[in-house]
């Protein structure tokens, strides 16, 4: 412990002496000071060593300036670290693909400060677009330094995402969608403004008006003992939906046939004897024939009984239900004729 303290004191004295001598010799012999220089370094824990210059003329001609440097183990480690720093930076640049000067600050990274292997993050502090792209293991040469980059990127595999473009897309408002949504207010309400109906669309039932045409001629059905006639109609306010002749049989009327209107066989009594449906002359001419054939009742009269001619006026209830039955038959015939005729037309238009 004592020799070390003595050596430290002696080194301090030498340094002060040579510093004063150097200040005096700086004005007289500046060249000699720069030509010959001796560096003496003392290291604790070992003998002092002197690093002399290899120039023999500097030893004999001009006394050189002596510089004393005190070093310990920590200074040696710091010097070694400083000398190894460029080599470490070089090794880091060859492994990761970016130099030490281009390493961003820790605030630019994520909270944990980690980065996945094989991914180079070029994010900046500005609000510009963020570009993330994966690396490919292709070797590229640098023209300035001659180093080989382990990870070089190609333009074909870059994936860029613009954050500002996403925010700008959300500001676009579809006016057409808002106008259609405003047509409906609360659930259960009716839409306010509807589009104008086209001319080819089906009009509302209030706009349709049926005009009945005159009755057609009687059609005799001698085998069934009936005759029928039909009445056509026209729809005003409807165009292009029904073919011509679709409403030719809008109403159909069925009645027992008469020999005055139908050329049926009287001997077979195909038509019933009804005084209300024939004139007095025709009924009187058939009177003897009727008396001779009272025992034979035709089959169609059994299936379809009629009121006897002796009753002057039927009961009001029977007359009412008869009118109801005739009205229902007319409605059924009109509906069946309309829908059977319009069904193929609507199928074609669809």
UniProtKB/Swiss-Prot annotation:
Tissue specificity field: High expression in testis, but low in other tissues.
PANTHER family, sorted: PROTEIN MENT (PTHR16240:SF2)
InterPro entries xref list: MENT (IPR029292)
Keywords for the protein's UniProt record, in alphabetical order: Phosphoprotein, Secreted, Signal
Signal peptide: 1-23
Pfam families per UniProt: PMSI1
Disruption-associated phenotype: No visible phenotype. Mice lacking Ment are viable and have no overt fertility phenotype.
Keyword Phosphoprotein assigned: yes
One term under GO cellular component: extracellular region
GO biological process: regulation of cell population proliferation
Summary of the function given for this chain in its UniProt record: Involved in control of cellular proliferation. Onconcogenic modifier contributing to the tumor suppressor function of DNMT3B.
Designated name of the protein: Protein MENT
Post-translation changes: Phosphorylation sites are present in the extracellular medium.
Localization of this protein: Secreted
């Amino acid at each position: 412990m004592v020799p070390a303290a003595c050596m430290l004191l002696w080194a301090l004295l030498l340094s002060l002496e040579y510093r004063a001598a150097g200040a005096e010799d700086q004005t007289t012999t500046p060249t000699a000071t720069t030509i010959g220089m001796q560096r003496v370094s003392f290291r604790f824990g070992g003998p002092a060593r002197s690093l002399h210059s290899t120039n023999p003329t500097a030893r004999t001609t001009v006394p050189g300036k002596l510089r004393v440097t005190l070093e310990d183990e920590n200074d040696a480690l710091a010097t070694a670290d400083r000398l190894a720093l460029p080599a470490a930076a070089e090794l880091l640049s060859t492994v990761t693909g970016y130099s030490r000067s281009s390493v961003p600050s820790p605030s630019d990274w994520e909270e944990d400060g980690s980065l996945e292997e094989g991914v180079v993050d070029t994010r900046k502090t500005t609000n510009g677009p963020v570009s993330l792209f994966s690396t490919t293991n292709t070797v590229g040469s640098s023209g300035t330094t001659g180093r080989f980059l382990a990870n070089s990127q190609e333009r074909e595999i870059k994936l860029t995402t613009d954050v500002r473009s996403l925010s700008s897309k959300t500001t676009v408002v579809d006016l057409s969608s808002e106008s259609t949504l405003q047509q409906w207010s609360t659930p259960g309400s009716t839409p306010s403004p509807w589009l104008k109906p086209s001319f080819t669309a089906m009009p509302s039932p209030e706009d349709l008006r049926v005009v009945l045409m005159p009755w057609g001629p009687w059609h005799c059905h001698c085998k069934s003992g009936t005759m029928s006639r039909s009445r056509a109609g026209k729809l005003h306010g409807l165009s292009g939906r029904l073919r011509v002749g679709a409403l030719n049989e809008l109403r159909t009327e069925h009645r027992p046939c008469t020999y005055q209107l139908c050329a049926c066989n009287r001997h077979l009594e195909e038509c019933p004897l009804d005084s209300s449906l024939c004139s007095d002359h025709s009924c009187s001419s058939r009177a003897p024939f009727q008396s001779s054939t009272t025992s034979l009742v035709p089959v169609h009269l059994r299936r379809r009984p009629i009121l006897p001619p002796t009753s002057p006026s039927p009961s009001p209830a029977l007359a009412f239900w008869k009118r109801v039955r005739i009205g229902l038959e007319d409605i059924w015939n009109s509906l069946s004729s309309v829908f059977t005729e319009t069904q193929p037309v609507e199928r074609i238009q669809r």
